[in-house]
Amino acid sequence: MKRITIIAGHYGSGKSEISVNLALNKKIDYIVDLDIINPYFRSRALNEVFEENNIKLIESTIEGMLNSDMPYVSGAAAVPFVQDHISAIYDLGGTENGGRVLIQFVDRIKKIEDIDMLYVVNIFRPETADKDKIIKAIQKLEGESQLRVTGLINNTNLMHLTTEEEVLLGEQVLDEVSKELNIPIVYTVVEETHDFEHQFKGERIKLSRLVARKWL
């Protein structure tokens, strides 16, 4: 995993759960919430999890109206970009303009070599249900953020009802995207309660639903 990892995906893709799980599993220093609309990381219980694991949370701070064409977040979000001893996961907003918040950091980001921007896909979400929709969403994100997506995360699921075949179906769709855009599948997400035997593409993330649980 790179020192800086930006996790992107459409609303409801599961990117926030993945961000938390990766931060815990990979012992990341910072998790940066760049979602200025939906405060998924702000529950007290989830913050306790971060504190127990020595993960610093940087939350979004709106400096202007929510509907601004160029929303800005706290300057603290830039700290991992300029201090190369800090590892961080950036969780982008899943709204239509979620990638725009990165523009204020783009000059710093482009100087970093040890960085990935990963796109999370659940093909059972209508916005990313097939190859063409996924490619369109990725290209839109790249246009907004002025950055390139470097990897794909297969998070195809129907929560606890998910079957191995459904995860494989998501992999098949993402294989098509991967070949067309030349972007590898770097992670496949499987809930920790499932014991699927298939060797999926990329590294397997055994997902614990911490965000959904702590949000309640």
Where are these regions (language model features)?
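Walker A (P-loop) ATP-phosphate-binding motif of ABC ATPase nucleotide-binding domains
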Residues: 4
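Hydrophobic anchor at the beta1->P-loop junction of P-loop NTPases
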Residues: 7
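Walker A (P-loop) phosphate-binding loop of P-loop NTPases
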Residues: 12
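Conserved lysine of the Walker
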Residues: 15
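Hydrophobic positions on the alpha1 helix immediately C-terminal to the Walker A/P-loop
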Residues: 18, 22
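N-terminal phosphate/diphosphate-binding loop that engages ATP/GTP or pyrophosphate donors
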Residues: 23-69
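Switch II (G3) loop of P-loop NTPases
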Residues: 60-66, 86-101
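Conserved catalytic-core segment of NTP-binding enzymes
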Residues: 97-201, 214
